[in-house]
Amino acid sequence: GKKYTFKLREDAKWSNGDPVTAKDFVYAWQRAVNPDTAAKSGYIMLDVKNAEKINKRELSPDQLGVKAIDDYTFEVELDNPVPYFLDLTVYPLFFPLNEKYMKEQGEKFGLEANTTLYNGPFVLNEWKHEQSFQLKKNPSYWDQKEVKLEEVNFNVVKDTGAAVNLYNTSAIDRVGLSAELVDKYKGQQDFKTINDPTVFFLRFNQKNPALANKNIRKAISSAYDRDGIGEVILNNGSKGAYGLVPSDFVKGPDKQDFRKENGKLSKVDVKEAKKFWEAGKKELGKDKIELEFLNFDNEESKKIGEYVKGELEKNLPGLTVTIKMQPFAQKLKLEDSGQFDISFTGWGPDFPDAITFLDMFITDGSQNKMSYSNAQYDSLIKKAKQEGSDVKGRWNDLLKAEKILFEDAAIAPVFQRGRSILERETIKDVYIHKYGGELSFKWASVEK
């Protein structure tokens, strides 16, 4: 269907005592699609009626297909049926906002603990930027009797060794491990590996004449060992990736895992890579090719970047790769403005459907960023976004679209992320989510 009616709980309150009402949802959704807001994830809401036209400034935000029927009834109309619409609503972009409070705070909203409003089990009590933050139990929360923890403290520690020392001295209860520490702690009872549906890959900017050549892209895709990256460099449960949609993420109508069903679409074969490379150079009339590799500025990415550079330069004669490491925000800016040749990047799901990965690469899509375009791919994705009833047909369209992406060697997969952590056995019921918010502490407790 195209119409959804949500009944809100009447006992939900904001942390300042205001009730949470349907108007808060109307305001939040209109704000999200308003082009003046420039919401990074605004595209996720474009299936709501008129959202696209509002985003293009053809209609005003109050024309969005959302209505407060009364204080506790919220109605949503879509442009066309979206099979995964209810899954979308757990994404933070769809959360309500208190208009009066936001307008009082103006530009300061959300920048400090005391310029933010809450309606969940915890409130942000203290926030020392780049150092630490503290959650405290929210006394206004409708279900606070279920919340067992009084507070949750987070430390921002960039050096993993220092963070593990804090764990070993009982100063913290949970810590992530880097590759070199995994083997040391693997045998401990508090060691855990978490499967993460986030996939890292190389984006090829086709504005670069060399990367506009399919043989060159295929050569690069086939010339580096992914399993080595997952098992040796990362050593934390990460696995080499051979497609875009991760494994253990979504199952089709016949209960088959998407990744299993579509198989390995991007193979590593140095012999083949050399053939593609020579063919590409010949087509370009070039013997030497120089490419810049845009990378994150953390330790892990640095190792991966250097490894990929080494493999590519060794296996593809005449190639020179220069690595450019950038802080996260600056890297995003360069990607958004197309100022890169190859970019090492990652994507995690916004909702549990393969389209959350595949939708990225439609022509001129806000997450495409690399001038990739294939009309057949576009039409399969468009169809899959609108197909509500033919579940099997839709699944097959998504499988087909992913195959096209790799026939074109539009991107080159690197690894699917795993995480190794130490977590005290006294900690119970911290829930880890594959999409939406990462962790839920509502039901968590610490056993004495």
Task: Please state what every model-predicted region is.
Residues 129, 277-349, 419:
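Ligand/substrate-recognition segments at binding pockets and active sites
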Residues 5-7, 20-26, 40-100:
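Surface-exposed binding/hinge segments that line
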Residues 48, 78-147, 151, 161:
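Gly/Pro-rich hinge or "lid" segments in bacterial periplasmic/extracellular proteins
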Residues 266, 318-333, 359-425, 448:
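Extracytoplasmic/peripheral linker and loop segments enriched in polar/acidic and small residues
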Residues 239-279, 300-303:
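Structural transition elements
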Residues 21-28, 71-77, 120-121, 149-151, ...:
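Alpha-helical secondary-structure segments
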Residues 113, 139-184:
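Ligand-site clamp/hinge motif
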Residues 421-448:
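Long beta-strand-rich cores associated with HINT superfamily self-processing modules
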